[in-house]
Swiss-Prot record:
Belongs to the GlnD family. It comes from the Bacteria. GO terms for molecular function: [protein-PII] uridylyltransferase activity; phosphoric diester hydrolase activity. This is Bifunctional uridylyltransferase/uridylyl-removing enzyme. PANTHER family: BIFUNCTIONAL URIDYLYLTRANSFERASE/URIDYLYL-REMOVING ENZYME (PTHR47320), BIFUNCTIONAL URIDYLYLTRANSFERASE_URIDYLYL-REMOVING ENZYME (PTHR47320:SF1). NCBIfam families: PRK03059.1, UTase_glnD.
Length: 858
């Protein structure tokens, strides 16, 4: 066949598609477009078969979504070529010509060629194949063979086996998507709460004879009319979303990728507000719809299961006058119990906690709660009985996180705490949160709960120890509920959240000291992280100032626990062992300071004495130690702890003026990174060259301390983390010692150093490209010295610190200390610097502009 024979078919098809899409843009109704696209392809296939006929006696059938009568703009065209017998040579040739022509038409066929017996074999082996074949539709060829096929598929269908298989398949699919509809980039088709879940319900219902659409399923008694309406609306919303994704990307794309979300928001007419991005508002709508589907999915599947696998109610066991255990699930005794007594809407969750043998709630209970949620109103919230019940839920020894999640899914928690409703499904495009605000909040509570469990004590030894000594753990859960509750409102979310927490504490009758603790935790929940990661913990004044802010040991314990739980609940990328050590160091230092603040001279003396003790253990004579220490000023001893001072001294006391750079490296104490010491003659570009080396090794600098001895030698210390965990840190340490020393030696010799950055580092994540952080640089004089404090915020990228180091070197700015805080794809770094350009307003402004250019990548 001549390919030019296909041109008229292709042109008619493309013109009809364009007209259908233009019509969709006018009315925005998904079903007419999906049906019209299906009709267009049906006609194109029939036209094609006039040129490329089927083998004699064969049938061409649409299967899968196409067989269902729905075709998305860029979906595969799923076809079954059904043969009456095994194909011979001419049959195979005809099929090859037909399939090649389908590709030439631009249809991207997903095709299979089978006999009737092969269809039955494949359907028995694979539930996905069986499901696709169930949704078959005759297109052309032998109608009698199609009838035989339909009869065979119907005859072999076992509703019970089909239900079990589809439920397992759905559970496996949900697991691939982390069992949550709240993914950052959800798949509108496959993610929990998406289109596939709706299709699974209808497949199960159809196999069991309960109907093919929502109206029929409702008439069969599996759904109420309002539930059917809600599911129909959600289905239409997801269908339109999938259509828009295909049209926007011009390919089969079902994921709401970061770079598509802003454009999709425009398509939907969603505008950015003063406090929320348009993309965040779009995603909140998506999450609300997915939550609805997820909840009704549970109810429907239970209802179908009860119809297919009826069990007697003789095993029901009364729990109290309102609830019973039925088949291991919490069941209501009377249908109208929540309408008669709305307080039971909270007590149901308390009963779940108090009866751990219950595997869940029955469909009847879930449905009754769902439909009675409107009974939680202002009067309900003011009821002292309900307030007491809510606190009891938080005070239980088990099931707190499970029930809070269930309360959120059933819309009970958002109705009881209206301020919580605002954050349900609220995405945070801040480059370090990977959960919606409500899911992050529940993750923080989960982390706090783990601190109370002996089986997790080895994961968080200090946190578990601190939690064991803390009274009234539930106060931490209240603080966690409110710590981010004001996100998206504008203003300081910590301050606004503290006011909400104070109001909650007053309304729920918390003791004054407990109310004050909760309010403090919400207001200061970012404090400990900021001090640990941005301030010099070796400075006694920093510790004393933090101790004054936390006031006492109870506040310190609670803040430490909330901080660790908060960071760990933000993103797997944000937490690392180094941050854990910083927080632990700050906790221990502050605990000591709360026992009595120490002045600088006392701390200095104790630090030197401890370093001297360590050096004696290493066999170093006191006179050798003192000779080296005379090269160092007070600032050095305040900037390093005793272990670091002893380590430096042990390697440098005999080479105070070396003829080449000295580099020593050891694994960090917590075992995740490297501690690096550089000792060499000081030069303006030393820090820049060191950063360039780290950048080339894909090392992330966490901490930098820059010191110059009285004789002009640089003694610099770094903590770096590798991009990926290293199997042998000691081998890496030896390699760095050699390579970095050689690089610095070449630089001092005047050699022009090549850019060693490796190619895979020169990339940014998609989210950071779509939602970049506005570069910021703030320069303030350091209140207790002659130096300056430079605070920068920007999107993280390869070579960022190297670029800043270059700006400092070019402007004659000396780096004294750097504290690097990386939060996912966002950096918040602090540099203590000095230099003549910082003393004059004009040159200071020029320096700030150069820093901003470096942050922006210009």
């Amino acid at each position: 066949m001549n390919p030019t024979d296909l041109h008229p078919i292709k042109e008619r098809m493309q013109a009809a598609r364009a007209a259908a899409i233009a019509d969709f843009r006018q009315h925005l109704r998904p079903d007419p477009l999906l049906s019209e696209l299906r009709r267009i392809v049906d006609q194109a296939l029939r036209d094609l078969l006039k040129l490329c006929p089927l083998p004699a006696g064969a049938t061409l059938a649409a299967v899968g979504g196409y067989g269902r009568g729905e075709l998305y703009p860029h979906s595969d065209v799923d076809l079954l070529i059904l043969l009456p017998r095994a194909p011979d040579g001419p049959d195979e040739s005809a099929i090859e010509t037909l399939v090649a022509s389908l590709w030439d038409l631009g249809l991207e066929p997903g095709h299979s060629v089978r006999t009737l017996a092969e269809c039955e074999t494949e359907a028995s082996a694979d539930i996905t194949v069986e499901t696709a074949l169930l949704e078959s539709r005759w297109l052309a060829g032998s109608r009698s063979l199609m009838k035989q096929f339909e009869t065979a598929m119907t005859a072999r269908l076992d509703a019970r086996a089909f239900f079990r298989a589809k439920r397992v398949e759905m559970q496996q699919r949900h697991a691939r998507y982390q069992d949550t509809p709240y993914a950052l980039e959800p798949n509108s088709k496959e993610s929990p709460g998406g289109l596939r879940d709706l299709q699974v319900i209808l497949w199960m219902a159809r196999a069991a004879g309960f109907g093919r659409n929502w109206r029929a399923v409702a008439q069969a008694g599996l759904l109420t009319a309002p539930e059917a309406r809600d599911l129909r609306r959600a289905e239409q919303a997801f269908k339109r979303l999938r259509i828009e994704l295909h049209l926007l990307t011009r390919r089969r794309e079902d994921r709401l990728l970061f770079d598509l979300q802003p454009t999709l928001a425009e398509v939907y007419g969603i505008a950015t507000t003063t406090t929320r991005r348009a993309s965040e508002l779009l995603m909140q709508r998506y999450y609300w719809a997915a939550r609805l589907v997820t909840q009704l999915n549970v109810i429907l599947i239970q209802n179908i299961e009860e119809r297919l696998f009826p069990r007697p109610e003789s095993d029901a066991r009364a729990i109290d006058e309102e609830f019973r255990s039925l088949h291991g699930r919490l069941d209501i005794i009377r249908e109208d119990c929540f309408e008669r007594n709305p307080t039971l809407l909270l007590r149901a969750f308390l009963v779940m906690q108090q009866h751990p043998g219950l595997s869940g709630m029955s469909a009847r209970t879930l449905r009754a709660i769902w439909h009675s949620r409107h009974r939680i109103d202002a009067q309900f919230r003011r009821n002292p009985v309900n307030r007491k019940l809510f606190l009891q839920i938080l005070q239980q020894p088990r099931g707190i996180v499970h029930e809070l999640r269930r309360m959120t899914m059933l819309n009970i928690l958002p109705r009881y705490l209206p301020v919580f409703r605002r954050i349900v499904g609220q995405m945070q495009h801040d480059l370090f949160h990977v959960y919606t605000v409500d899911q992050h909040t529940l993750a923080v509570i989960r982390n706090l709960r783990r601190f109370t469990m002996p089986e997790h004590a080895s994961e968080y030894p200090l946190a578990s120890q601190v939690m064991a000594g803390l009274d009234r753990h539930w106060l931490l859960y209240v603080a966690a509920l409110f710590h981010d509750i004001a996100k998206g409102r504008g203003g300081d979310h910590s301050e606004l959240g503290a006011r909400d927490a104070r109001r909650f504490a007053q309304e729920h009758g918390l003791a004054p000291e407990d109310a004050e603790l909760v309010e403090f935790l919400v207001r200061q929940h970012l404090l400990m992280s900021a001090v640990a990661q941005k301030r010099d913990l070796s400075d006694p004044e920093v510790i004393n100032e933090f101790a004054r802010q936390v006031k006492d040991e109870r506040h310190l314990n609670a803040l430490y626990l909330l901080t660790v739980a908060d960071i760990r609940g933000t993103s797997p990328k944000v937490w690392n062992a180094w941050k854990g050590k910083l927080l632990e160091d700050l906790y221990r230092l502050t605990l000591a300071a709360l026992g009595g603040a120490q002045d600088t001279r006392t701390v200095l003396a104790e630090r030197k004495e401890e370093a001297a003790r360590l050096l004696r253990l290493a066999g170093l004579r006191d006179d050798a130690r003192d000779a080296f220490w005379q090269q160092l000023d007070v600032a050095y001893f305040l900037r390093h702890d005793a272990s670091e001072i002893a380590w430096h001294t042990r390697h440098l006391y005999y080479q105070v003026q070396p003829d080449k750079p000295v580099v020593k490296v050891r694994p960090t104490e917590e075992g995740s990174g490297l501690q690096i010491m550089v000792y060499t003659r000081d030069t303006p570009d030393l820090f820049m060259n060191t950063c360039a080396y780290f950048d080339g090794k894909a090392f992330s600098i966490q901490d930098a301390r820059i010191h110059t001895t009285r004789q002009g030698w640089a003694l610099d210390s770094f903590i770096v983390l590798p991009a990926e965990p290293l199997a042998d840190l000691r081998a890496q340490a030896a390699l760095v010692e050699h390579e970095l020393a050689e690089r610095l030696r070449q630089a001092q010799g005047g050699a022009r150093l090549a850019d060693v950055r490796v190619f895979h580092r020169n990339r940014q994540s998609r989210v950071s490209r779509v939602f970049p952080v506005m570069p910021q640089a703030e320069l303030h004089p350091d209140e207790r010295s002659q130096s300056w404090r430079l605070s920068v915020t920007a999107t993280d990228r390869p070579g960022l610190l190297h670029a800043l180091a270059r700006v400092m070197a070019e402007n004659g700015v000396n780096l004294i200390m750097a504290k690097i805080m990386t939060l996912g794809d966002r950096v918040e770094d602090v540099f203590i610097i000095s230099g003549a350009v910082l003393e004059r307003p004009r040159t200071q402004m020029q320096f700030e502009h150069a820093v901003l250019d470096a942050l922006a990548g210009e």
